[in-house]
């Protein structure tokens, strides 16, 4: 904690810190550390989501938002919409706001893979209307 200001305490009112995880291994490694840190405003970002992730052990009242997004780029790994909905349900159960911010370039929904251009990934996530 030597890198934070002397008056940090449990964090500043105007600073939100997010922790990104892309798979279960990184969630289980990073999130216990993240949750133990003196940060007033925390969010968990699953991005790029490259596999199903169970956040139920980590989402609680100390987390202000759970956010999910797929991977962009020509070589993007697929993101399954069912994984996104599972994170959403985990957030709802924990009374944590959820945000689906980006589909990624390869979104699987109902067994079909959709190739979504970068310029439409945010708008397509909004159109899902699951926030």
Language-model-derived ranges and their functions:
Residues 32, 50, 56-131:
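Auxiliary Fe-S-binding modules of radical SAM enzymes
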């Amino acid at each position: 904690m030597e890198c934070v200001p002397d008056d940090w305490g449990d964090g500043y009112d105007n600073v939100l810190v997010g922790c990104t995880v892309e798979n279960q291994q990184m969630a289980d490694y990073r999130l216990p550390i993240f949750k133990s840190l003196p940060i007033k405003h925390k969010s968990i970002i699953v991005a790029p989501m490259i596999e199903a992730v169970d956040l139920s052990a980590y989402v609680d009242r100390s987390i202000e938002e759970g956010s999910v997004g797929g991977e962009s780029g020509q070589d993007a790994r697929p993101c399954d919409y069912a994984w996104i909905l599972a994170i959403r349900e985990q957030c709802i159960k924990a009374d944590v706001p959820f945000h689906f911010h980006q589909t990624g370039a390869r979104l699987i929904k109902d067994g079909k893979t959709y190739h979504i251009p970068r310029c439409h990934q945010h708008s397509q996530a909004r159109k899902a209307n699951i926030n």
